[in-house]
């Protein structure tokens, strides 16, 4: 059962009849992503019994194929992950540091060291249950066989066409013929990226940052004029750290630690931060998953700016990220759980620029503390994209009161697996 937009989970009715392909009986969880194809992948993972961590990993690799302007394999980011059984919440951080300097400062270009694959590898080890290959395969299929260009990617292409048009490899990937870029609804095939994702699927994430593929990637970036080295890839690690936490009655609110934007989200949640407005800038993407056991994962990944370094590494299909730690402050997922039962009460992400962390905190405050309907709170956001699931009585305690929603502009999508 696919449920889009903002709704009460109790309002779900089966869109597919029993005994028909695609029918899902019972509640399996909910997902939100900034791009619809990725949300569909996350929903399918949950419907097949996967965990919230599995769904988040699969959505990231799907996004790498469908929204490379914000979430390519060249990205970095941060996730918050909660286990209901142990009542523990942790932050998995994988900021993308600058790679080495270009060999020729006049003709070369600077890139960030890609860390998102390393981050997803760690997330899967700690919070996954499904086989790694089955999660990566969804993104591989979207790249190899093609997927319809979403409104989200079409918007980014319209804003960034002139920026990426200066790179021959990028022009080739986005060109649908006669120098015209793919647009909304066009089926978009990326064979090089499909091959890269197949390598990650078969050899595991470790090959991307310290194996044979890592060496190939570093060599290809250097041949194109960048400064990425094998040492850069091996040294840019993902880590498990303590998130920021704040008491909310009998609950705990969890925020991403610095250098990410958690402090800004925390301030807005407390009522002392910025508003919900601001222009959309792009370059980041948020996604979240909550499974039927009450486990939750919320992530934000980013490219440093829209389309990152605006360079695609030939032969890999990877849009490289741009260096610059300032973009970390724009990434800020959030969770709220009950410290006695471990039940999840809220999961949220935001993307789209400097105002995104404050927008997330404000929507969380309005829905959880002021009991504003989620649809109303999301409708007031101007610029950033906020995705959220909020359960006033807790997901396991009373999921029928949960609300789930993506931005009302139609760029992202919220889906529920089951009823």
Question: What are these model-derived regions, one by one?
Answer:
Residues 9-11:
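C-terminal motif of bacterial Sec signal peptides marking the signal peptidase cleavage site
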Residues 13-171, 194, 204, 224, ...:
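Proteins synthesized as precursors that undergo proteolytic processing into mature forms
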Residues 30, 46, 161-258:
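Accessory "access/gating" subregions that flank catalytic or transport cores
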Residues 385-419:
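Cofactor-centric catalytic regions
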């Amino acid at each position: 059962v696919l449920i889009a937009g903002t709704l009460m989970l109790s309002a779900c009715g089966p869109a597919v009849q029993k005994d028909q392909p695609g029918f899902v009986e019972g509640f399996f969880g909910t997902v939100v992503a900034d791009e619809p194809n990725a949300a569909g992948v996350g929903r399918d993972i949950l419907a097949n019994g996967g965990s919230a961590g599995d769904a988040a990993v699969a959505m990231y690799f799907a996004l790498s194929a469908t929204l490379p302007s914000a979430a390519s394999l060249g990205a970095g980011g941060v996730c918050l992950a909660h286990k209901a059984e142990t009542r523990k919440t942790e932050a998995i951080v994988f900021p993308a540091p600058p790679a080495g300097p270009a060999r020729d400062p006049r003709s070369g270009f600077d890139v960030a060291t890609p860390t998102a694959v390393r981050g997803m590898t760690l997330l899967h080890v700690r919070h996954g249950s499904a086989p790694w290959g089955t999660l990566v395969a969804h993104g591989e299929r979207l790249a190899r066989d093609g997927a319809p260009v979403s409104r989200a990617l079409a918007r980014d292409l319209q804003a960034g066409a002139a920026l990426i048009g200066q790179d021959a490899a990028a022009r080739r990937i986005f060109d649908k013929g006669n120098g015209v870029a793919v647009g909304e609804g066009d089926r978009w095939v990326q064979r090089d990226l499909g091959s890269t994702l197949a390598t990650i699927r078969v050899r595991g994430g470790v090959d991307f940052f310290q194996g044979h593929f890592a060496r190939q990637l570093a060599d290809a970036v250097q041949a194109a004029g960048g400064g990425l080295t094998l040492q850069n890839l091996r040294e840019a690690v993902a880590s498990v750290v303590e998130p920021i936490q704040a008491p909310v009655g009998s609950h705990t609110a969890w925020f991403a630690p610095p250098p990410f934007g958690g402090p800004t989200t925390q301030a807005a949640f407390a009522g002392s931060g910025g508003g919900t407005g601001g222009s959309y800038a792009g370059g980041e993407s948020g996604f979240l998953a909550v499974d039927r056991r009450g486990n939750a994962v919320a992530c934000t990944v980013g490219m440093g700016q829209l389309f990152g370094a605006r360079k695609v590494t030939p032969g890999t299909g990877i849009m490289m990220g741009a260096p610059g730690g300032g973009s970390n402050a724009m990434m800020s997922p959030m969770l709220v759980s009950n410290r006695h039962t471990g039940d999840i009460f809220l999961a949220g992400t935001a993307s789209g620029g400097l105002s995104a962390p404050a927008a997330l905190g404000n929507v969380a405050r309005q829905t959880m503390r002021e009991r504003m309907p989620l649809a109303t709170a999301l409708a007031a956001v101007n610029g950033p994209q906020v995705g959220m699931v909020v359960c006033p009585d807790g997901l396991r305690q009373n999921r029928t009161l949960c609300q789930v929603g993506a931005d009302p502009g139609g760029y992202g999508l919220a889906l529920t697996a089951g009823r």
